[in-house]
């Protein structure tokens, strides 16, 4: 069975109505974290719509479709109740236990832990602690979130329309 998600995990409270105005529909993960599904088309489109330019500083990423537009920083700032929101951008691409995962963790505009390579390391940095044989990934239920929601499909067409 496959596992393919790309998302932002935001630490702390956020404005749900404002988030939804950006097509960010939160899923509570526990540990004060909320998951928002995104993808590279989503981030490119919001970069265009917000008029931002540039890329986030990423480390240890070997994926050409990992979202890295500066618009993501601005979206997190806009919906978070913190002046410098903490969040991780994560990505999985597995099938039958083989594949890749990537994660970077941020405090607003700063890559907060350039050594973080895995989703578990990013989640640990955001405060997830294990209490059993489960790792951080499974403690927050990411193992049960196996694919992207259908609403993101529109961003592929929008990216073409916007030329991004």
Give the residues covered by each predicted segment.
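Charged interaction segments
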Residues: 31, 37-164
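Short, extreme N-terminal segment that most often corresponds to the first beta-strand
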Residues: 1-30, 162
């Amino acid at each position: 069975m496959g596992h393919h998600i790309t998302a932002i995990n935001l630490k702390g409270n956020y404005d749900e109505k404002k988030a939804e105005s950006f097509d960010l529909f939160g899923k509570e993960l526990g540990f004060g974290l909320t998951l928002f599904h995104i993808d590279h088309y989503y981030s490119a489109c919001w970069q265009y719509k917000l008029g931002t330019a540039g890329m986030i500083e990423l480390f240890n990423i070997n994926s050409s479709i990992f979202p890295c537009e500066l618009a993501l920083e601005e979206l997190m700032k806009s919906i978070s109740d913190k002046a410098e929101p903490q969040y991780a951008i994560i990505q999985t691409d597995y099938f039958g236990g083989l594949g890749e995962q990537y994660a970077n963790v941020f405090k607003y505009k700063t890559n907060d832990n350039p050594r973080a390579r895995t989703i578990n390391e990013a989640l640990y940095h955001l405060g997830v602690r294990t209490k059993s044989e489960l790792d951080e990934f499974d403690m927050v239920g990411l193992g049960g979130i196996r694919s992207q929601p259908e609403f993101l499909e529109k961003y592929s067409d929008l990216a073409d329309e916007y030329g991004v």
